[in-house]
Amino acid sequence: MYAIVYKSDGFPVCQQVAGVSPDPVVTWNTEAEAKAFISSKGADADLQPVSLTDEAMDKIAQAMGCAVESMMFEPYPS
């Protein structure tokens, strides 16, 4: 599973859901799908896919200012 994060600060692409905090992190099944999404938005310079390893999830949680345990995930497309 892959998330897409901003290269500048590691903050992930999230889906805003009313009443849910933190916002769910959007995920893609493959790196190719994540890269295709980035390219479709013309955001290759700003975004990058990351495999959701334990280390990556720790970094994403830190960027979001929350505990890893409180993170939720939403597959793309939802």
Question: What do these predicted regions represent?
Answer:
Residues 1-78:
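Conserved NAD+-utilizing ADP-ribose enzyme module
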